Amino acid sequence: MAVPKRKMSRSNTRSRRSQWKAAEETLVTSTVRGQVAYSRPHTARVVTDSAGTPLYLEYKGRKVKDL
């Protein structure tokens, strides 16, 4: 493990840490029953019945897993 040769000042430490930013989450749009739905890419979608009960997971139009 690398060991720093000198102590890093509080100012330099904080300015270095301030450059780190969380990446904005990417969303994919899909149309479900005539409504636009946003979801994360490469994740399965939960298919529900009219009462809202989850039935199964769907990915790229295929049934993946029963719930």
UniProtKB/Swiss-Prot annotation:
<comment type="similarity">
    <text>Belongs to the bacterial ribosomal protein bL32 family.</text>
</comment>
<dbReference type="GO" id="GO:0015934">
    <property type="term" value="C:large ribosomal subunit"/>
</dbReference>
<dbReference type="GO" id="GO:0003735">
    <property type="term" value="F:structural constituent of ribosome"/>
</dbReference>
<dbReference type="InterPro" id="IPR002677">
    <property type="entry name" value="Ribosomal_bL32"/>
</dbReference>
<dbReference type="InterPro" id="IPR011332">
    <property type="entry name" value="Ribosomal_zn-bd"/>
</dbReference>
<feature type="region of interest" description="Disordered">
    <location>
        <begin position="1"/>
        <end position="22"/>
    </location>
</feature>
<keyword id="KW-0689">Ribosomal protein</keyword>
<feature type="compositionally biased region" description="Basic residues">
    <location>
        <begin position="1"/>
        <end position="19"/>
    </location>
</feature>
<dbReference type="Pfam" id="PF01783">
    <property type="entry name" value="Ribosomal_L32p"/>
</dbReference>
<protein>
    <recommendedName>
        <fullName>Large ribosomal subunit protein bL32</fullName>
    </recommendedName>
</protein>
<keyword id="KW-0687">Ribonucleoprotein</keyword>
<dbReference type="GO" id="GO:0006412">
    <property type="term" value="P:translation"/>
</dbReference>
